[in-house]
Amino acid sequence: MYNVAIVGASGYTGGELLRMLLNHSEVEVNNITSRKYDGTPAHKIHPHIRDSGLVFKNKQPSELDADIIFTATPHGASMKIVPDLLETGTKVIDLSGDYRYRDTKVYEKWYGLEHTSDIKGVYGLPEIYRDEIKKADLVGNPGCFPTGAILSSYPLVDNDLVDRIVIDSKTGVSGAGVNPSSTTHYPNIADNVNPYKISSHRHVSEIQQELHGFEDVKVSFTPHLVPVIRGIQTTSHSFLREEHSDITPDELRKFYEKTYGKEYFIKLMDDGEIPHLSSVRGSNFVHIGGFEIDDTGRIVMLSCIDNLVRGASGQAIQNMNIMLGLDETTGLNHFGLNP
């Protein structure tokens, strides 16, 4: 058994980490930290894990005796503690944005924070960077929007098929975090669709890093808040390069089958089948569909993920499994909750 600790376990992602790790056959959670809830039993904050026996403690990094540590802290906090954690010889998976970027200047521009650590993490998207993750001591867990957007578009840029991608994502309110605000107040979200940060959401920089890095691909992104609790539905409009303007939907599908055909957590929908949020809720699966091309050369791809699982904690556990040499699906091979 491997010992696991979670730094900052009181939020939604921390709760999901606990839910899944407590059902994981190869690990034991031995420490969960929180300054705010020091001394509080975990089930007082996360009532769904009653009788886990876990209690929040305000511990220093050097006091965490673990083989692998998840840092589920606010942006800017992880970079202050991760170097000390790595010095103890443990492996770290960071769920904040602090270690997702290859260029810290990009992070500083979009997060408005000075990056004080010169340590580089591996970008934790297993279907693309599995070999790098296997050897990593530090993994930067991808953001929720980038996970669905990148996976639904990656075969297009990897095969140099498109030169422009316009991404539209609908997200549930849990993506805004555990603290209430006027944005997530029920009367403001019910019976409504709220676009926000329509051209300036920080996750566009993460998507651009992973998609623009292949070729001269221009990426645009707009998120919308919708009145559901969990899930991100992404529609990607990608525009074919002129030299590929005669590609057919069947040929398009073959690129995705070649890329994802052996990937357990990625499910490609049949022709005419639309992925739904309700099908992935509570699971680590990514459902991808669409595969349509219109007369203008626009490819329409769709994806659905659970933002708290595949978009955060489930993907972090998938990365943990890879880093520890375990079967990648351990603790994650459960299907979604429907209805």
Curated annotation (Swiss-Prot):
As for subcellular location, the record says:
Cytoplasm
Supply the InterPro entries for this chain: AGPR_type-1, NAD(P)-bd_dom_sf, NAGSA_dehydrogenase, Semialdehyde_DH_NAD-bd
Q: Name one GO cellular component term.
A: cytoplasm
Q: Name one GO biological process term.
A: L-arginine biosynthetic process
Q: Which reaction does it catalyse?
A: N-acetyl-L-glutamate 5-semialdehyde + phosphate + NADP(+) = N-acetyl-L-glutamyl 5-phosphate + NADPH + H(+)
Write the Enzyme Commission number(s) for this entry.
1.2.1.38
* Pfam families for this protein: Semialdhyde_dh, Semialdhyde_dhC_1
Keyword Cytoplasm listed? The answer is yes
Keyword annotations for this protein, in alphabetical order, are:
Amino-acid biosynthesis, Arginine biosynthesis, Cytoplasm, NADP, Oxidoreductase
To which pathway does this protein belong?
Answer: Amino-acid biosynthesis; L-arginine biosynthesis; N(2)-acetyl-L-ornithine from L-glutamate: step 3/4
Recall the GO molecular function terms of this protein's record.
Answer: N-acetyl-gamma-glutamyl-phosphate reductase activity; NAD binding; NADP+ binding
What this protein is reported to do is described as: Catalyzes the NADPH-dependent reduction of N-acetyl-5-glutamyl phosphate to yield N-acetyl-L-glutamate 5-semialdehyde.
Query: What family is this?
Result: Belongs to the NAGSA dehydrogenase family. Type 1 subfamily.
Q: What is this protein called?
A: N-acetyl-gamma-glutamyl-phosphate reductase
Q: Which organism is it from?
A: Methanobrevibacter smithii (strain ATCC 35061 / DSM 861 / OCM 144 / PS)
Native organism taxonomy: Archaea, Methanobacteriati, Methanobacteriota, Methanomada group, Methanobacteria
Gene name of the record: argC
